[in-house]
Regions:
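Flexible inter-domain linker/hinge segments
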Residues: 226, 389-415, 531-548, 555-558
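Nucleotide/phosphate-binding sheet-loop regions of phosphoryl- and nucleotidyl-transfer enzymes
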Residues: 1-397, 426, 432-435, 442-447, ...
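Short secondary-structure boundary segments
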Residues: 44, 481-482, 517, 774, ...
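Conserved alpha/beta-domain cores
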Residues: 104-105, 525-531, 535-885
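Structural motif
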Residues: 249, 418, 435-439, 456, 458, 480, 549, ...
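Hydrophobic alpha-helical bundles that form the membrane domains of multi-pass transporters
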Residues: 476-477
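Extended, non-globular alpha-helical segments
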Residues: 404-444, 493-531
């Protein structure tokens, strides 16, 4: 097995197709070098195979138990290093003219800022003198060395950043320098000694001087960073597999910190926030790449390069054009100017906001250089992009703006200010809405950024760590708000002091920071939103419909506005919980005689009829699936514990409360999820289901009389066998016969127990349709109680790799998904025309929708606000090429 490839290695396939092996950064560096022949510093890539071997190569090894340095890797790295030295005419560690390299991570999927980078590797106490002599610039040499010692100490040796930062600040103050670029050489040389002393104090060892030891240490650090807490947290959030590993890229250094004819920057071929055509980005003069994203200095706009470096700016724009033509997408780049020479250090398809993704996708269908098809444009937009454009925005009304910064990630965020990632995470764990406030963020802050409703930094630009991560996650963010002066757990801005726990608001669309909680409104999607969804609907038409879960006329009308093609789940129990209905339900439960029960049911029938009428009216002409009562009756009664507490008080219980207590005790269940609910409740109280069916059919008849076209589907919950469904079907048909409605009506059942899935062939004989209730099917298949395991057990299972996905968010393909496939196959074998749908929360999850399409389902159903996401995901599923039933 080959572990190391030079950037210019002649691969049999296009390098950009080898991201599994080379990682995204390595594949694109090879593509730019060997295919596009852009100015890229020479280097080589250590593959993801090597990382996986290192992380889990020993027997029993795993992500938290390193397998060790792979056999043969040392020799391969040495061979590629000799080639690199030959091509550059320099040798690593040469005291007279040293080659310096960067060591960077590069996983298959972009994980900006989550893993580690080491720059200027190869410097030591001797080679720094050679670098100073060769360049004639002692300041540059020691600036590079102090950066290397600091990075190596933090990333490879695991030292905290704060002591390095403190020494740096002291050096700058002592020298009277305005910023890092003006600290003189002698102060930087002293700073190197301070840094080395820090390393020895914390580790008990002197700073490594052998470049070979430095290189191996840096490679291992990048491997280890794949299993680091921030990278794991990012992958859990982004649903990236822990098994992929990261590649490592070793590349000859070019220097943006050499002089004022040098610089470094991050550039996008289009605006990643709005999608507007034209170059976009930030850069710094006399700086190294990490300075731009770290927010150490506020950056210059890319357009400023036209004034400072006009010929290089033109060259960069020409490269941007070539990259867009080649990748047929917006690209994110990193570049360095080394004494007037432009070098490209990285490119990748750039992360973007939801609005930008929509605009780019539509624009690129008419861009002569790209000519995307409608299908390609639809595939460029993700579910997360749609969610972002539906993000809340700052509404009307007076607001108190206390500072402004750069609008880094759109949307409105409201919450309590917290000044460390740990404090933010703790507050979010208590259920508080949090705004994370930092001078600048770093990868160590990820656990606080994940839970934040908004992010505010006082330093940094639009390509800083905070901006890039927030845009990728759709978290509102304002960065570079230099009017915000942070002092410990408070900040001052606009004459106001904001302390930890005070409520502030950030507007990532305008850059405003506001005191207090602002009014938040639902945003208006851009016109491209409807364009993309229209194309998505054309792609999935006749293959996979999208319905909504809605319980009221207002919900149904809202769902229809979002493009729902019917109601896949109308939960009748929600109609019972209204303040004016609950007393009637309790009278029905407490009834001592059949007459009393019938009287209560009659009152409920009248109320439910009105509810059903509103839903049928909103969905006129489209199918409405009504699930008969599902939860156990004790959910409509007061809690036994509350009644017992009141009974112990001097006033005691009223007569009605005593009756409620007896009923609550009678209907109490130790495991309600597996108790008397669904069709089992109908067996004990058949009059309840008969009442609901009559109310529904009478509402449908009234709709017909009013000129409507109701399409009714009656669904029996929680059946486990044919006999049970046959009994329930009899109740329904008897009730329907009492109402001459002239209405299209079918009767089906939910498949939500493993037994029902296994016996689907028999159940299909009594059903016109199946709807998979994947919430309960997941609970019963795993033996998980969702309410009990999601807050404590699930995070541990995900972080330790025991589960790759939360099965309540994305369907478990190997278990629950297989039951869905099996039930669909057996049901259709018994009844070829059987309609199949899903109404659990998985119906709005893109990955789950792909499985449902493959299983041959006719529709998915989800909450109204996820209907647009499901429409897009259904089109993606159709375009994936996985045929139904495969």
């Amino acid at each position: 097995m080959t572990y190391v490839y030079a950037f210019d290695h002649p691969h049999e396939k296009p390098p950009m197709s080898l991201k599994d092996l080379l990682g995204g950064k390595g594949a694109n560096l090879a593509e730019m070098t060997s295919v596009l022949q852009l100015p890229v510093p020479h280097g080589f890539t250590i593959t993801t195979d090597a990382c996986r071997a290192y992380m889990g190569g020993r027997p029993g090894g795993g992500p938290n138990e390193p397998g060790g340095w792979p056999a043969g890797l040392t020799e391969e790295v040495a061979a590629r290093l000799v080639e690199l030295e030959t091509s550059m005419g320099k040798r690593l560690g040469d005291p007279a003219d040293p080659l310096l390299v960067s060591v960077r991570s590069g996983a298959k999927f972009s994980m900006p800022g989550m893993m580690d980078t080491v720059l200027n590797l190869g410097l030591n106490d001797e080679s720094v003198l050679g670098l100073a002599k060769q360049t004639g610039d002692e300041r540059f040499a020691y600036d590079s060395y102090r950066r290397f010692v600091s990075m190596y100490g933090r990333i490879v040796l695991g030292l905290p950043a704060e002591p390095f930062d403190a020494h740096f600040d002291k050096a700058r103050e002592r020298s009277g320098a305005e910023n890092d670029a003006t600290i003189p050489a002698d102060a930087l040389a002293d700073l190197v000694e301070d840094y080395k002393a820090l390393v020895e104090h914390h580790t008990g060892m002197t700073f490594p001087q052998d470049p070979a030891d430095q290189l191996r240490g840096a490679i291992e650090a990048v491997f280890r960073s794949w299993g680091g807490a921030r990278a794991v947290a990012y992958r859990v959030k982004e649903r990236i597999s822990h098994d992929l590993g990261t590649a490592v890229n070793v590349q000859a250094m070019v220097f943006g910190n050499r002089d004022d004819n040098s610089g470094t920057g991050v550039g996008f071929t289009r605006d990643p926030a709005t999608g507007a055509a034209g170059a976009y980005g930030d850069f710094l003069v006399n700086a190294q790449g990490e300075d731009v994203v770290a927010g150490i200095r506020n950056t210059l706009k890319l357009a400023e390069m036209q004034r400072l470096f006009p010929s290089i700016y033109d060259e960069l724009l020409a490269i941007f054009d070539r990259l867009e033509r080649h990748y047929r997408d917006m690209c994110d780049t990193e570049f360095t100017i080394d004494q007037g020479k432009l070098w490209m250090l990285q490119t990748r398809v750039g992360k973007r906001t939801g609005g930008a993704a929509l605009r780019m996708a539509v624009d690129m269908t008419t861009d002569e250089r790209m000519r995307l098809t409608h299908a390609e444009a639809v595939q460029r937009v993700t579910a997360e992009h749609l969610e972002q454009v539906l993000h809340p925005q700052v509404g009307g009304g007076d607001v108190q703006v206390i500072a402004t910064g750069l609008a880094a990630s759109p949307g409105a965020g409201v919450g309590k200010a917290y000044f460390t990632a740990d404090a933010a995470a703790e507050a979010a764990g208590r259920g508080e809405a949090v705004i994370l406030v930092r001078s600048e963020t770093s990868p160590e802050d990820v656990h606080g950024m994940i839970v934040a409703k908004g992010i505010l930094t006082s330093r940094g630009g639009l390509v800083s760590h905070a901006a890039v991560v927030a845009r990728g996650w759709g978290t509102p963010a304002v960065v570079g708000a230099d009017g915000v002066h942070i002092r410990g757990a408070s900040f001052e801005a606009g004459g106001v002091t904001v302390k930890e726990g005070d409520v502030i608001s950030v507007d990532g669309s305008t850059g405003r920071v506001m005191l207090g909680a602002v009014e938040v409104t639902v945003s208006e999607p851009p016109p491209e939103f409807d364009t993309i969804l229209g194309w998505a609907d054309e792609i999935r038409a006749g293959k996979l419909a999208v319905r909504a879960n809605a319980d009221t006329g207002a919900d149904a009308a809202n769902a229809r506005r979002f493009g729902a093609e019917g109601i896949g789940l109308c939960r009748t129990e929600h109609m019972f919980l209204a303040d004016d209905r609950l007393p009637i339900v309790r009278r029905m439960i407490l009834a001592d005689t059949a007459e009393d029960e019938t009287a209560a049911l009659e009152e409920l029938r009248v109320a439910q009829k009105a509810d059903f009428y509103e839903v049928l009216e909103a969905m006129d002409g489209l199918p409405v699936t009504v699930r008969l009562l599902d939860p156990p009756l004790h959910e409509f009664l007061p809690r036994t514990e509350d009644l017992l507490v009141r009974a112990s008080m001097p006033a005691g219980l009223s007569e009605e409360e005593r009756r409620l207590l007896r009923a609550a005790e009678a209907w109490h269940e130790f495991n309600p999820m597996l108790g008397i609910r669904g069709v089992r409740l109908g067996v004990l109280k058949p009059g309840l289901y008969a009442m609901q069916v009559r109310a529904l059919m009478e509402a449908a008849a009234d709709r017909v009389a009013a000129g409507g076209r109701p399409v009714v589907e009656i669904m029996i919950p929680l059946t486990i066998g044919r006999e049970e469904l046959a009994l329930a079907r009899g109740w329904v048909e008897e009730a329907v016969a009492r109402v001459s409605a002239g209405v299209d009506m079918t009767i089906g059942t939910m498949i939500e127990t493993p037994r029902a899935a296994l016996r689907a062939g028999e159940i299909a004989e009594e059903a016109d349709f199946f709807s998979f209730g994947t919430n309960d099917l997941t609970q019963m298949t795993f033996g998980f109680s969702r309410d009990d395991i999601e807050s404590r057990l699930m995070p541990a299972y995900l972080e330790q790799g025991l589960l790759k996905r939360n099965p309540f968010d994305t369907i478990d393909a190997a278990g629950v998904g297989e039951l869905v496939m099996l039930a669909a196959e057996r049901g259709r074998a018994a009844k070829p025309g059987l309609k199949l749908g899903v109404c659990g929360e998985h119906g709005g999850d893109p990955e789950s929708i792909t499985l449902f399409h493959a299983a041959g389902l006719n529709y998915v159903s989800c909450s109204p606000f996820r209907v647009p996401i499901a429409r897009l995901a259904a089109a993606h599923a159709v375009l994936s090429g996985r045929a139904p039933g495969s």
